[in-house]
Amino acid sequence: MRFGSTAQEYTELLTPCNILPSFRYVYPYLKNKKILDVGSGTGEYLELFSHNSEGIDCSKKNLEVCRKKNLKVKLFDINGKLPYGEDRFEVIFCSHVLEHVESPINLLRECNRILVRKGILIVGLPTESTIVRRIYDHYFNSHPEHLYSFSIDGMNRLLEKTNFVVVDTKLDFALLHKFKLNLVEDFLQNFYKMLFGISNAYWIVARKK
């Protein structure tokens, strides 16, 4: 994974998709849990989690920023076996990471291995649809390191193959956030399959079988 040569570049690169306003939909699954943030970057999400949570990332620069925030982090290339034993975490948080790794299915298997029984996996992904590309062309053009693009159905199949069951799906609508239309976004979540193409990102919450 390569997000840029400096932590500042990483932060600038991920600003459009990092602390998504739609994070409020998945936060209840994270509250007061022992969490591993896979691809924790400069810790924007990690610092919102409980004190016994930790993160892993492949960038020394990013981890330096995390440590200045007193966050527990570890340097690791997540393309390999994760450096933890089985049944270690209650929740694994993986935001805008799977599209970058060499083998998404292997990472999902590793997440399953280190989750406790019925533990929760939260995956955040960009939506790379035609409509969104027209509106956010600058975003996608600045992300040549994306190796994969996932539809909701495609992601669901990967999760099923790696021993997860999907329990929730939420979309992120950037234009609605711009105009502070949170109630409209709440309503539109009921039609996520129909509206996937006009969202800019989405979350999937899955439980270990």
Where are these regions (language model features)?
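Conserved N-terminal segment of class I S-adenosyl-L-methionine
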Residues: 1-85, 91-95, 108, 169-172, ...
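S-adenosyl-L-methionine-dependent methyltransferase catalytic module, highlighting the catalytic core
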Residues: 2, 8, 12-21, 44, ...
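A short His-aromatic
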Residues: 96-100
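Basic phosphate/pyrophosphate-binding loop/patch that engages nucleotide-derived ligands
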Residues: 113
